[in-house]
Amino acid sequence: MKRSLGAKPLLFPTPVLVVGTYDDQGRPNAMTAAWGGICCSKPPCVTVSLRKATYTYASLMARKAYTLHVTDEPHLTASDFLGMASGRDGDKLGTLGLTTVRSELVDAPIIQEYPLVLECKIVHVHDLGLHTMFVGEVQDIKADARVLDEKGHLLLDALKPLGFMPEVRTYHGMGPALGRAFDAGKLHMPKKAE
């Protein structure tokens, strides 16, 4: 018998995303967020949800853009720090020795050391309660060559992305592929009459 866990945001794993913005002084800043993901295929859109109290919130409202960096295993501690410290208190990226370049497509920084980044223009803002959801239309995705195959597809084994388990606050790696989507379930499809 199943046990009730109550009403709470428990879907997992959530991606470990680093949101890049420029603050009101034009300085690059970044924070880690776990509330985010894909929300639309055409146009390609992703979301990230933040509390109004965060330093990044005002930057998103002012700049109408963000970059979304996918955290990989080598950047676990850096991403965790970016979620713990506030840009109000100092240069978090400088503390970590991370370098940025200005996106050519949106008014937000790209952190060079992260292997995968989505450049997003904010197209919708939804105040949901404690969090505000920022829907970003993806303008482009930049990826290091080492995480791509010869056709330009992402190699998860090379990327080594992290997932986050919200309830127990733990980071997890990704395992090997277990099957192909829209293929593994074919054995349950009814046979077509000949």
UniProtKB/Swiss-Prot annotation:
Q: What intrachain disulfides are recorded? A: none
Cofactor detail note: Binds 1 FMN per subunit.
In this record, what's one Pfam family?
Answer: Flavin_Reduct
Q: Which cofactor does it need?
A: FMN
- Alphabetical list of InterPro entries matching this protein: Flavin_Rdtase-like_dom (IPR002563), Flavoredoxin (IPR052174), Split_barrel_FMN-bd (IPR012349)
Q: Which UniProt keywords apply?
A: Flavoprotein, FMN
Query: From the UniProt record, which GO molecular function terms apply?
Result: FMN binding; oxidoreductase activity, acting on the CH-NH group of donors, NAD or NADP as acceptor
* Alphabetical list of PANTHER family matching this protein: FLAVOREDOXIN, FLAVOREDOXIN-RELATED-RELATED
Q: How does it assemble?
A: Homodimer.
* Family note: Belongs to the flavoredoxin family.
Q: Function, please? A: Participates in the reduction of hydrogensulfite from hydrogen.
Please report the name of this protein according to its UniProt entry: Flavoredoxin
Source organism per UniProt: Megalodesulfovibrio gigas (strain ATCC 19364 / DSM 1382 / NCIMB 9332 / VKM B-1759)
Point out the gene that encodes the protein. Answer: flr
